[in-house]
């Protein structure tokens, strides 16, 4: 197999990268009806597999789980997840031939083996679904021409897919049809019905492509979503401890600070996040973020270049073939960092204190979001895709850090995301440690400015506000958040 993206000519590559359209609610008028009366078989019962299946069943679809015979015989966790929730569970050989839609929700590194195993068992004219297109785009999986290949990619962890559905809503979702595999022209009908079955249509769906989803997803998770949180946590903790801040306070400020600060992003973008700071703190955060952008832009661009060229995938798949030696080694190193092992503390930190004493974190978030967005859009990825894979997902990932530090983040994200996170953080951490942090003081991380006045120069503040508010990520973010708010009011009757 060869990298599918690299087999396309430049015009085709740009066309696929640029696929992104916010779909009207009316396009989902029939909701999941297209799949009713048909058999949906999910392969894999982890977080995405279980929670998508629960939602689809509650939407009136016939859902079953196909597992390897060994997983059934040994009653592994995937078997327990499905069985304890009342689903039909059986072997590939039993269920796959019955399926009208087979959804592969196993980890990326298992996709080739899974698809090569289930494809001979699939009936003529069935459909194969993915929630991440790595296998198709990066590994170049060749799929039988009679099979329709679709993607429904919720933009959040699987647990959130379920919780939002139970609230009567859903999570924003990318949907796509593989242009090489739509023999009956029903791909979009299948994808829309599947997305509606998960509740994604209530939050808003983007008509995308396998290529756009993969390239933007890889870039976001490697840089701002995971890599920047990891590198920022490590160097910020080191700085605070070196300057005499109590370890329990320093760790707590970081562990819960990312979540608190990025929650402001969710409601009002970078503008609102920066507005949570006092005027002097806002100016300081802006100045720091500009320094960070200049320092880190080459690293962000290198990751984007390696993702576009396929170099990242080649490197990671070589590690797969070597029993994940690098992945496991980097995971162990992360577990040994000082931040991961800070002592628990019952010190209370108010919401505003996370902003006041975490000015550097705000600066890192602004710099990281804008750098990731700029690198993606400069490579042909449409603004909407770049927004979802940078700013939108950041509060969700920050929430995992709040639960159990970096360990939880790396457990919840995919192995692909974890590997990319380490590649980025392994370079970003020493870069920040050596080139940026020596000039940083605890007035921006740990203690606050302690200003007695909110006064700043008017011209300076106006220039800072203009720069923040006029970034393209703010324009597209405001538009997409308004769509989601409108849909939420419709969905929950608000």
From Swiss-Prot:
Keyword Iron-sulfur applies: no
SUPFAM superfamilies: 6-phosphogluconate dehydrogenase C-terminal domain-like (SSF48179), NAD(P)-binding Rossmann-fold domains (SSF51735)
Residues reported to bind Mg(2+) 1: 217, 221
All copies of domain KARI C-terminal knotted, residue ranges: 209-344, 345-487
Catalytic reaction equation(s): (2R)-2,3-dihydroxy-3-methylbutanoate + NADP(+) = (2S)-2-acetolactate + NADPH + H(+); (2R,3R)-2,3-dihydroxy-3-methylpentanoate + NADP(+) = (S)-2-ethyl-2-hydroxy-3-oxobutanoate + NADPH + H(+)
GO biological process, one term: isoleucine biosynthetic process
Domain KARI N-terminal Rossmann: 14-208
GO MF terms, alphabetically ordered: ketol-acid reductoisomerase activity; magnesium ion binding
Family indicated by similarity: Belongs to the ketol-acid reductoisomerase family.
Protein name, as recorded: Ketol-acid reductoisomerase (NADP(+))
Species annotation: Aliivibrio fischeri (strain MJ11) (Vibrio fischeri)
Gene name per UniProt: ilvC
């Amino acid at each position: 197999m060869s990298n599918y993206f690299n087999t396309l000519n430049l015009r085709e590559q740009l066309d696929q990268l640029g696929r992104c359209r916010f779909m009207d609610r009316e396009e989902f008028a029939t909701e999941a009806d297209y799949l009713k009366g048909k058999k949906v078989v999910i392969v894999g019962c982890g977080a995405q597999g279980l929670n998508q299946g629960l939602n689809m069943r509650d939407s009136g679809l016939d859902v079953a789980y196909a597992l390897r015979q060994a997983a059934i015989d040994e009653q592994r966790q995937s078997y327990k997840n499905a069985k304890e929730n009342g689903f039909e569970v059986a072997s590939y050989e039993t269920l796959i031939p019955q399926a009208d839609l087979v959804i592969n929700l196993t980890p990326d590194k298992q996709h080739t083996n899974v698809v090569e195993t289930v494809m001979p068992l699939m009936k003529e004219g069935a459909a194969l679904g993915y929630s991440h297109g790595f296998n198709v785009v990066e590994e170049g999986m060749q799929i039988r021409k009679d099979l329709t290949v679709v993607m429904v990619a919720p933009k959040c962890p699987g647990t959130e897919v379920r919780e939002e559905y139970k609230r009567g809503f859903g999570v924003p979702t990318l949907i796509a049809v593989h242009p090489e595999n739509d023999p009956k022209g029903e791909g979009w009908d299948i994808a829309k019905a599947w997305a509606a079955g998960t509740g994604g249509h209530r939050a808003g769906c983007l008509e995308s492509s396998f290529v756009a989803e993969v390239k933007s997803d890889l870039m976001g998770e490697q840089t701002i979503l995971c890599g920047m949180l990891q590198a920022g946590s490590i160097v910020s903790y080191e700085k605070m401890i070196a300057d005499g801040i109590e370890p329990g306070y320093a760790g707590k400020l970081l562990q819960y600070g990312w979540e608190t600060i990025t929650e402001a992003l969710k409601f009002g973008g970078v503008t609102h996040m920066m507005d949570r700071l006092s005027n002097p703190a806002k100016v300081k955060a802006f100045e720091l973020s500009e320094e960070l952008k200049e320092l880190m832009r080459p690293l962000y661009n290198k990751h984007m270049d390696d993702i576009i060229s396929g170099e990242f995938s080649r490197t990671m798949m070589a590690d797969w073939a070597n029993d994940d030696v690098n992945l496991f080694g980097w995971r162990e190193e992360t577990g040994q960092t000082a931040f991961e092992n800070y002592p628990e503390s019952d010190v209370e930190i108010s919401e505003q204190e996370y902003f006041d004493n975490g000015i550097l974190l705000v600066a890192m978030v602004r710099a990281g979001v804008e750098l990731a967005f700029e690198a993606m859009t400069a490579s042909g990825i449409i603004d909407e895709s770049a927004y979802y894979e940078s700013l939108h997902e950041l509060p969700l990932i920050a929430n995992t850090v709040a639960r159990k530090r970096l360990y939880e983040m790396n457990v919840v994200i995919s192995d692909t995301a974890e590997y990319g996170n380490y590649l980025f953080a392994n370079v970003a951490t020493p870069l920040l440690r050596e080139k940026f942090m020596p000039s940083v003081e605890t007035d921006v991380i740990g203690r606050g400015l302690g200003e007695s006045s909110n006064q700043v120069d008017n011209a300076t503040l106006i220039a800072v506000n203009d720069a923040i508010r006029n970034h393209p990520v703010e324009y597209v973010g405001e538009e997409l958040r308004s769509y989601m708010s409108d849909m939420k009011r419709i969905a929950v009757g608000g």
